[in-house]
C-alpha cells in the first residue's frame, strides 16, 4: 500500500504587511529586506482570527479537494508552534468543528519542519493498514510571537495555513522516501524567550539550513532509487530566498522548477510547504507522475524531507 496526498487546501489572511509598512515600524528598508530574504510582503491574521480558525479553513478546503467526508477521517495532525493555547490542542478543536468525531487528534511541534513530520507520521498509519485517511495541517500565527521592534526578525514572518489529506494512492505514486532529523544542540540558535518573542541567531541558522536542506534533499532522492535528473519540482521551506536557492542549486534544478512564495507570504513556518504545494498544483506547474522533493528545517533544530511522485 502506498500513501500519498489526495487533497490540498490553504488559508491566506487578507491583511498585507509590506516592506514599506515595516519601514515605518522598525529601522529597516525595502531594499535591505528584499536583497537579504527575498521577502516583499507578508500576510497578518487579524486579532479575532486564531490559529485554529486558519487551520479549520484550510482543512475544509483539503477535504473538499479530496472528496472525503469529515466523518471518514481517522487521524488529525496539526503542525504548529503557535496553538491557541496549551490545551485543548488545535487538532482537537478542529476535530470538533469539522465533525470528524471518530478521528484521533494531536498537535506536532517541530517548528518549520512540522508539516514534514506530520506527513511522515500519517504515512506510517496508512501504510500499516491502521488508518485510511489522515488530515495533516501546517498552520501558524507567527505575528503573535514576533517582536515587532526587532529588525532582524520582524521582517521575516507571516501567518497562514495549509492542509493535506493523506490516503491510499496507486502503485508507484505517493511518498517514495523520507528523512526526519533533529539536533537539540542547536536549540539555542532559534527559540522562544520568556516574553514569547522569537529569538534567532541568523548566521548559525543560515549555515545549518543551507547544509541540511541540500543534504536531506539528496538523501531522499537516493533513498527513492532516483537521481537528480528525475526530480521535476522542488518545494522548499520558504524561509529565505538564499537558503532556497542553495537547495535548488544542490539538486541542479532550473529556477522555474522551484516553488517561490516567500516574496508574498514571508516565512510561515509549518504552513509554508503546504501553501506552496497547493499554489503550484493550482497553477498547473506540477503534473500527474511528477517527482517532487519537499524539504524543510526549523527550530529544535529539526529538519525533514520527502520525495513524492504526484498523483492518485
Curated annotation (Swiss-Prot):
Region (ACP-binding): 238-242
Gene that encodes the chain: fabH
Protein's name in the database: Beta-ketoacyl-[acyl-carrier-protein] synthase III
Compartment list: Cytoplasm
Keywords: Acyltransferase, Cytoplasm, Fatty acid biosynthesis, Fatty acid metabolism, Lipid biosynthesis, Lipid metabolism, Multifunctional enzyme, Transferase
Source species of the chain: Bacillus pumilus (strain SAFR-032)
Family: Belongs to the thiolase-like superfamily. FabH family.
Domain of life according to the entry: Bacteria
Any GO CC annotation of this UniProt entry: cytoplasm
Subunit and interaction comment: Homodimer.
Amino acid at each position: 500500500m502506498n500513501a500519498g496526498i489526495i487533497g490540498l487546501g490553504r488559508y491566506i489572511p487578507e491583511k498585507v504587511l509590506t516592506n514599506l509598512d515595516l519601514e515605518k515600524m522598525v529601522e529597516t528598508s525595502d531594499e535591505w529586506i528584499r536583497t537579504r530574504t527575498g521577502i516583499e510582503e507578508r500576510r497578518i491574521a487579524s486579532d479575532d482570527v486564531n490559529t485554529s480558525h486558519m487551520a479549520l479553513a484550510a482543512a475544509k478546503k483539503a477535504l473538499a479537494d479530496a472528496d472525503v467526508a469529515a466523518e471518514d477521517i481517522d487521524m488529525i495532525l496539526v503542525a504548529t508552534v503557535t496553538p491557541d493555547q496549551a490545551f485543548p490542542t488545535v487538532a482537537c478543536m478542529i476535530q470538533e468543528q469539522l465533525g470528524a468525531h471518530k478521528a484521533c487528534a494531536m498537535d506536532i511541534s517541530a517548528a518549520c519542519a512540522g508539516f514534514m513530520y506530520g506527513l511522515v507520521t500519517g504515512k506510517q498509519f496508512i501504510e500499516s493498514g491502521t488508518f485510511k485517511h489522515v488530515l495533516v495541517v501546517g498552520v501558524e500565527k507567527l505575528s503573535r510571537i514576533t517582536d515587532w521592534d526587532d529588525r532582524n526578525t520582524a521582517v521575516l514572518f507571516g501567518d497562514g495555513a495549509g492542509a493535506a489529506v493523506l490516503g491510499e494512492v496507486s502503485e508507484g505514486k505517493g511518498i517514495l522516501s523520507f528523512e526526519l532529523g533533529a539536533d537539540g544542540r542547536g536549540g539555542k540558535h532559534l527559540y522562544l524567550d520568556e516574553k514569547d518573542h522569537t529569538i534567532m541567531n541568523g548566521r548559525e541558522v543560515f549555515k545549518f539550513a543551507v547544509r541540511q536542506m541540500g543534504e536531506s534533499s539528496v538523501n531522499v532522492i537516493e533513498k527513492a532509487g532516483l537521481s537528480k535528473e528525475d526530480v521535476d519540482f522542488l518545494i522548499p521551506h520558504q524561509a529565505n530566498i538564499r537558503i532556497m536557492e542553495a537547495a535548488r542549486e544542490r539538486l541542479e534544478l532550473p529556477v522555474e522548477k522551484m516553488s517561490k512564495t516567500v516574496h508574498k507570504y514571508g516565512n510561515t513556518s509549518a504552513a509554508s510547504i503546504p501553501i506552496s504545494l497547493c499554489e503550484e498544483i493550482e497553477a498547473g506547474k506540477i503534473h500527474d507522475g511528477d517527482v517532487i522533493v519537499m524539504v524543510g528545517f526549523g527550530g529544535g533544530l529539526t529538519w525533514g524531507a520527502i520525495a513524492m511522485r504526484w498523483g492518485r
